[in-house]
Every structure is written in C-alpha cells, then in structure tokens.
Amino acid sequence: MAKVFKDIWLIPKLVLVTLVSFSCVHLTYCQEKIITVEAETIEYKRIDTISLNLHIYKPLNFSNDSTYNCIVFFHGGGWNNGHPNAFKRQSMYLASRGIIAISAEYRIKNKHNTTPFESVEDAKSAMRYIRKHARKLSINPNMIAAGGGSAGGHLAAACGNIIGLENPNEDLSISSVPNALALLNPVIDNGPDGYGYQRIKERYLEISPIHNITNGAPPTIILIGTKDKLIPVSTVETYKDNMETMGSRCDLVLYKNQEHAFFNKGEYFIDTTYQIDRFLKSLGYLKGPNTIKK
C-alpha cells in the first residue's frame, strides 16, 4: 500500500508516522538553556578489573521519600567506542521534567576488547541492577524505559526483545526488560543485510532485535533520518510493521534529509527530545507541558 507523507502526518490519538522537515521551521528553547543537573555515579557491575557505572540525573526536587519513573540511555559508537555523556543533555532535560534519567556505561571493543554480545549482556545487567535496587534508587520498577542511539539503540532494543545473553551469575528472576523504548537511529537488524553482521555472522539470530520481536514487546518510538546510510528507512518500517503485527505500539518519526547520528545537533536535538517527551508523557512517565520547545 502506498504511503503519502506530508511535512507532519499525525493520526488522531496515536502518532503512527511523522515526517519532520525543518526547511521553513525554526525551533527555539522554552528554557534559555537546559537546567544543569550534576550526575551521581554508582557502580552496577564489575568484571575483573573493569568497573561499569551508572550516571544518574535526578529531579531538582528529588526526595528519597518519593518514587520516580525512569529512563536509561545507552550511548552509540558501533559497540567500539563512545561515552555516556552522549545523552547528558537529554538526561538533564528529562530530570528537569521530573523523572530519573540514567546514562549507562558498558563494555566496548576499543577499551575492553569485547564483542557486541558482551555489550548486550552489560545493558541487561544495568537494567536488572536498576530494577533490583529500585527502592533504594527511589525508582518505580514498573516504569523503567530504555533508550539509545545507533549501537546504544540496539542495546535498548535488545533488552526489550532478545531472550538470553544474560549474565548467569545474576538473579535472573528479576527482569531486564524495559517497559518502553525510545530509539534514535537504532541498529535493529544484524542479519546478513543489516549492520554489524561481519562481527556477528551466523549468531545474528541471537542478537538481532528485528528477528526477535514477540508478543508483549515494549511500546517503542523510533526517530531516524531519511538519508541514514547505515540504517535504511525500509528496515525501521519493517520493524514497525512487525511490532504492530504482534500487537505492540511502535511510533516512527522520520527526519527529512538527515543522516546517521543527527539527533544531537541543534534543532534536531530539540525536536527529537520533544518527541521522546511526548511519547513518554503518553505512557504516563511525564506530566505537564514540555519545556524543550515553543
């Protein structure tokens, strides 16, 4: 069936596909700048001498006596490199909106000589640690979303869809599955025609999110540029169709003429953060009006 796109295409009650173009649109912050929130750092996992940390951004009015919804971000970098500060601004903004935002470290090839499989294991360990210690962290264990960009989006999607790749030494009775997913130009296909296949090869079915969507997959939003040379739009459209076939929500926001890793740049940072805000609000994670754009 042919799809017709306008600059912004909205379906009442549920955003299905949105195509965003900024050729004639100039977005501005409602806040003069995002409120600075200093992250607290705690170790969630140790492998021999490797320490992996969570960088936790709390609301300004944080109280240990309250319980907060949460989102956990995983940075991109092809499972090779990257830094949790990649999602610092998103984390500070969402903390200013009243939830706890966390940016998680995980093992990467250039630093730890690891493969994507270890990266997925660490992402699952991070989700499990947060849920296990939810009371201590003042987090609602049933409202923990995950998000990320590129390979970090893959890790979030893998937590939501992949069975296995868990650390057997952890308490596997505690779920590592996020309750929602916010994915920015995510790696979702590791098959022969997808990204990263040369590193994964015949094991791709163990780690490829698009090949493992099942009933009950977490509600998801995907934000991607139409000129992304690493993640074809057709791939995310197939992912969306598969999600909906399984009865799960999957919103897709396309950014006209944008390439891979566009989302931290200028007006695209503003709008992608706004779209994530709107998505999380629709699921009850956030309340009140957004403060990221007019």
Task: Please tell me what each predicted stretch does.
Residues 31-66:
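N-terminal cap/lid segment of alpha/beta-hydrolase-fold proteins
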Residues 222-224, 228:
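Short beta-strand/loop motif that positions the catalytic acidic residue
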Residues 75-80, 150:
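Active-site glycine-rich loops that stabilize anionic/oxyanionic intermediates
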Residues 83-84, 90, 104-141, 265-269:
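Catalytic nucleophile-loop/oxyanion-hole region of alpha/beta-hydrolase
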Residues 66-76:
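Short beta-strand element of the alpha/beta-hydrolase
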Residues 1-34:
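Bacterial Sec-dependent N-terminal signal peptides
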Residues 55, 233, 237-240, 244-294:
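C-terminal catalytic histidine-bearing segment of alpha/beta-hydrolase fold enzymes
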Residues 125-195, 204, 209:
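Primarily recognizes the serine-hydrolase "nucleophile elbow" in alpha/beta-hydrolase
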